[in-house]
From Swiss-Prot:
It comes from the Eukaryota. The gene is MT-CYB. The keyword Amino-acid biosynthesis does not apply. This is Cytochrome b. SUPFAM superfamilies: a domain/subunit of cytochrome bc1 complex (Ubiquinol-cytochrome c reductase), Transmembrane di-heme cytochromes. Signal peptide: none annotated. It is found in: Mitochondrion inner membrane. Heme b b562 binds at residues 83, 182. Its main location: mitochondrion. Its cofactor is heme b. GO terms for biological process: mitochondrial electron transport, ubiquinol to cytochrome c. Binds 2 heme b groups non-covalently.
Length: 381
């Protein structure tokens, strides 16, 4: 009997991607996050679709429609909390996925890495426009502040900002188009994910040792499907604990007040997953300089393959590179903390030092560490 899984044109694609896929035998739990991100994206699209059925993208009714979802729609509170906290889980998995890529040298698979960085930027854009939709105080002022950054672009800045707004300030037209963007972008993300996986199929997965794993591979199913299922259980446990016990702990209390253009909140700040970039933005007194540093903090990932100087693919065996990597991790946590603090001393100077160290680590120190490791490997006789 012919095995349909291996011959059917559609099932064959699924089979080669998730069942008979040859995977390195030594990949650790750090390789779980790809599948977890797929689950997060699915949760976000499904919950978002149900929320869109009840949401109205009008400045007069947006806030009350979100309240209506939470109070009157069957399980609306659950769908809304899953969507809001699902975004936090999505970014947590994203940051860990990128961190694993840096630690184990996955950025050497350039096409997969570059599509991944584009995916990161697209997800960040989607999350930003989504945060504006409830039309609370922080939604409105966050949108005003971030879109205002466009006006820092020389010559065309003001025109560009007004074009995005659809008027002379953040208003009804802005909310309507942000809802349109927030609806369409997840489907663009899905298409990019397929391209990401396509490039990954070309090279095969990386592995902790950084050594070519072709000599020792095992089928993805059942070994890694079981392993991913365990990761999925942990993800759902954390997400449901957050949603059912403390759904508003990661949000901002100001967003429980309807948007008021005449009343500025004491401290405008985005969601926690943007705080590191927000701190870098604030660390430079010049508006254009801050915007460029903000963009550079993400786009710097694109040049990582060119900054790779060591002969080793992975940091697994190199204590110097490992130390710098964990300093970078601690530095990003510090920047996240600073981003949530008011713009005053001593937070300003801490933010400036952490921002400088962020770029210094990636551009110079990690590059020098690679050269030092190469030197240490050379025979001395």
């Amino acid at each position: 009997m012919i095995n349909l899984r291996k011959t059917h044109p559609l099932m064959k694609i699924v089979n080669h991607s998730f069942i008979d896929l040859p995977a390195p035998s030594n990949i650790s739990a750090w390789w779980n996050f790809g599948s977890l991100l797929g689950v997060c994206l699915t949760i976000q699209i499904l919950t978002g679709l149900f929320l869109a059925m009840h949401y109205t993208s009008d400045t007069l009714t947006a806030f009350s429609s979100v309240a209506h979802i939470s109070r009157d729609v069957n399980y609306g509170w659950l769908i809304r909390n899953l969507h809001a906290n699902g975004a936090s889980m999505f970014f947590m998995c994203l940051f860990l996925h990128v961190g694993r890529g840096i630690y184990y040298g996955s950025y050497l698979y350039k096409e997969t890495w570059n599509i991944g960085v584009i995916l990161l930027l697209t997800v960040m854009a989607t999350a930003f426009v989504g945060y504006v939709l409830p039309w609370g105080q922080m939604s409105f002022w966050g949108a005003t502040m971030v879109t205002n950054l466009l006006s820092a672009i020389p010559y065309i800045g003001t025109t560009l900002a007004e074009w995005i707004w659809g008027g002379f300030s953040v208003d009804k037209a802005t909310l309507t188009r942000f809802f349109a963007f927030h609806f369409i972008l997840p489907f663009i993300i899905m298409a990019l994910v397929i391209v990401h996986l396509l490039f990954l199929q070309e090279t095969g997965s990386n592995n902790p040792s950084g050594i070519n794993p072709d000599s020792d591979k095992i089928p993805f199913h059942p070994y890694y499907t079981i392993k991913d299922a365990l990761g999925l259980m942990f993800l759902l446990l954390v997400l449901l604990t957050l949603v059912l016990f403390s759904p508003d702990s990661l949000g901002d209390p100001d967003n429980f007040s309807p948007a008021n253009p005449l009343n500025t909140p004491p401290h405008i700040k985005p969601e926690w997953y943007f705080l590191f970039a927000y701190a870098i933005l604030h660390s430079i007194p010049n508006k254009l300089g801050g915007v460029l540093a903000l963009l550079a903090s993400i786009l710097i990932l694109l040049i990582m393959p060119f900054l790779h100087t060591t002969n080793q693919g992975s940091m697994m065996f190199w204590p110097v590179s490992q130390t710098l990597f964990w300093i970078l991790t601690a530095n990003l946590i510090t920047l996240t903390w600073i981003g949530g603090q008011p713009v005053e001393q001593p937070f300003i100077i801490i933010g400036q030092l952490a921002s400088t160290l962020y770029f210094l680590l990636i551009l110079i120190l990690m590059t020098l560490a690679g050269l030092f490791e190469n030197y240490m490997l050379k025979p001395k006789w």
